[in-house]
Each structure stands twice: as structure tokens, then as C-alpha cells.
């Protein structure tokens, strides 16, 4: 057991985590050169296309160190985006140490800090690694000082390597062996295994990735899931070398996968403890804190026949992605669907794409909203995650919106632009610290503004140099109103949104104009209105298509013309009272982009 090392690789987006993992696998011979490809751990098509890691992946390698011993390295490659920070904290719970990879050209960025503090809070050994030293812009000395200055860990001795060219990888492996502590645990105690991740295999059922904390797990053992009390037989178990390899035993301290023929998706929730059926452990391992979704949106299948398939797909996906929340919802405009909770907009996009690709569904998303705390006049406090759930205005004492604490790191040159952006987003500055050429800014900004397009705007005002990390801070009273969109006097529930009162006229006008472009012209006028309660704040009209009824009249009597026009007018009036307007798909998507195009 003293030769096992469990660690995660953490870093900011694009600092080279996945490439470093590739090199470690190659150096330790986990895959033959023929099977090796770039970012071999990013196995999902989506990950390859976008060039980002979404799912944390684990690998077991054997490394023969310079002291002649062979060490077993279990490592987990984690995502860097703030939306997937939950994957990172789960991976860290299974480890004793973490490699903090920092790009020697870019230096410390916001995610570097956030992930590093998560690791330190969990009492992990953090080993800094300076990557990308082959770049002409690399300045390892400056970056090492930056790490000490901003993060506060000793980095002068940090290994300098280049994951792309393979320089210094041996040193990284030696560092891992010497710096990261071996796992602690009692091989003879009752079995306790922590479920780090699960996914659904159509042939095997639920496959779980586990870390054995105490005891051992053998093939054929009877195990019990502690939260549900259900017992299962272990059919297969093994490790990833990134390929799935079967073994007969998982020893104390190891990380591996287990198949117990669990058909039920909720059979082995992530963060749960497995123990042996005959000799159960007395206590549950401390799992992970549940993350609360920050962004909610309605997802609806385009054809109502897909509803069943959509429900199953969501179930399978939520097993693999523990931070996804969903509950059934129905809308008059869109039929039956689900209200889903996500950690951020990128997360939402990814989930939607995965559903469309892996499960072959066509979906519509409604405008994303955050959770508001609403105090009603009878003193009851409710949490509202969708505009349609908001009680009528005269029943509300106050609405409180969620405030996010945003930590930004950026070069001094862009400070002015970024502050202007934060103020525009109704932000309040709480802290500002200079580190050499970098500035660390802390702002409290309403979550609704952060979630919408803050990250994109921040990147564009700072030419990509600023980085962001945010988390929920508290609820705070604000003057929020619900804007309803009415088409010919009918409210369309899927188009409603909750906005700040000052922005309401502007957002309403923008939406109405956008809808006017997208709704096809009919035989009668279509009035599109935005309203707060009964007060109309914006309106536009899609003009009717009309025949020229006077074409056949040449000169002659005006009363004849009047009669024909009058007749047309009556016909249009009758059509309008009967006709209903189909709102096309694009109109719902337009809402997502309101305010983005500037």
C-alpha cells in the first residue's frame, strides 16, 4: 500500500492538463504508441470538438521509479471550467494530492486559485508544475514568483516541464512519488468504498468508479449500498489503463471500476459508500457537499412523442452528471417537458448537446433564469426557479435575487474596461489587490447578470486575458419584475422573463422587436406586446398580407371602392378573431440571445 499514489491534475482552462495526462500515460506505458492519440482521455466527441475536458477520467499506471521501486499511480484528469468545478471537487475527494499545473506563459489565473484552495481545504498535498516551457513567451521564474505571491505555496523548486514535447516528465513522476503521501486505510477493516462517479452502460447496467478507503473488494463479493440499503453481487471489477481492464481484486487505497448489474439508475448515487453485506462498516464516508444548480431552464422535446425517451435520457445523464437537477414541467405553448437545473450556461449547452447527440432528441430550451427568493404577503418564503411560478404582484412583499461573488484576475491595462462592465451589470466592488502586473478584483454581481453573458463580455473587453471564478454568496432584496410577452392578447408562458425593473422597458422592447422579425406574416395583423402585470411597456405589429381588392376597378364610383375595402376589412376582422399564431422555434432561441449581440 505504501507504493500507491492517488492524485488529481488541476489547472485553469487550457493550461495543459489533458496533454500532461497523455505524456504520463505514454511514459508509463499505459497504451502502446499505436493506440496513443492526442488528449486520449477526452473520449466524448463533444470534448474533442470543443477541445475541453467535461468529465473527469481516471487512469491507473505503474511507474518504476529511480529508487528501483514500482509505484502504482492512480490519477484523475479534471475539467478546468468553472461550470464543472463539481467534477473537480469530487475527484479531489478520492486523492491524497494534486498536481497544480500552471502555464508558464499565462501565469496564475482565477480557476488555478479556486481549484487550489479547494484542494488545500481538503488537506491535500499540492504540487506545483510549470507547464509549456517550450513556448517562446514562457517565463517560468516570473510565474513561480506569481504562484508564491498569489496562491501562497512554495514554487521555486517547482518542476519545469513541457507536456507537448515531453521535457521534464520524468521529474514530474519523481515529484509525485516523493511529495504525495501514500493512502491511509486499514486493509483488514470492514470494506468502505467511496463512489466517485457512475455512468450507464447499455449492456452492463450501472458502472461505478470507486476509491477503496478501508478493506478490500473482490470479484464475487456481496456488497451493500449504504444510503439505500440494497445488496448486490460484484460481477466484474477492474482498473482503467485508460482501457477498461478486468482484475479480480481491488486493494485498500486503489481506484477502480465496479459492475454489480444494477439496473436502477438511482441504485448507486455518486458520493455514496459501498460496504460488504456480511460485515458492514459502522459509518458512512464523508461524501461531497451537494451542489445547488445556479441556472434553471425548461427543456421540451419538439415532438411530444419523444417525451418518454427524453425522460429516460435525462435519467441516464443525471447518473453520469451528479450536478444536473430535473423535474417535470408543462407549458401551454410547448407541451410537456422538464425544468432542469445547471451549474452555468456552458453546462447547459453541453447537456443539451449531449441529449441531442447521444440520445437523438430534438429539444427547445426556454430562457435561462436563476432562483429567486420570494416573500409573500402572508409571510411565506418560496423559491422560484421559473417565471411562471412567480405569484401575482399584489401577493409579493419582496423579491430577493441571488448575488454571486466574482473573483477576477486580469492585467492592469484592462482594469478600466472591466470595472465599467461590472458596474453596468449592477456590481459592487468589495476588494482589489495588485500583484505585480496583475490585479485581483472581487465584485458582488447579481447571479442573473453573471449567468447571462458576463463571461463572454469579460473575455471580449479584456481581449481574453481576464479570468473569472464565481460562487453563490447570498440573497438580497431587489426590484425585480416579471415581463410577459403577449401575442394578440394571449400570454405565451414560455417567453416570460424576470428582470430588474430598470432594465424592463429596454429588454421588453428588444424582445418584441426580435419577435417581430421572426414571426411569419399572416392574413391579419399580429400584435406583439410586452407587459408588466397589466401595464404594456412595448409593442410592435407584424403587418398583415393583403390582396389589392381595388385592382379591377377602373375609375368610376368611389362608393364601389369603399364597399370592397369595407368587405375586406370585415373578413380580416373575422380571421383575426378565429386565427391563432404559431410561434416558430427560432423565436424561443431568440430570447436566449437578447442583449448578446452588442
Curated annotation (Swiss-Prot):
Enzyme Commission number, as recorded: 3.6.5.n1
Reactions listed under catalytic activity: GTP + H2O = GDP + phosphate + H(+)
Principal place of residence: membrane
Location in or out of the cell: Cell inner membrane
Residue ranges annotated for the tr-type G domain, each copy included: 2-184
Keywords from the named record: Cell inner membrane, Cell membrane, GTP-binding, Hydrolase, Membrane, Nucleotide-binding, Protein biosynthesis
Membrane topology value: Peripheral membrane protein
Binding residues for GTP: 14-19, 131-134
GO BP, sorted A to Z: positive regulation of translation
The protein's role, per its UniProt record: Required for accurate and efficient protein synthesis under certain stress conditions. May act as a fidelity factor of the translation reaction, by catalyzing a one-codon backward translocation of tRNAs on improperly translocated ribosomes. Back-translocation proceeds from a post-translocation (POST) complex to a pre-translocation (PRE) complex, thus giving elongation factor G a second chance to translocate the tRNAs correctly. Binds to ribosomes in a GTP-dependent manner.
Classification via NCBIfam families: lepA (TIGR01393), small_GTP (TIGR00231)
Protein name: Elongation factor 4
Gene (UniProt): lepA
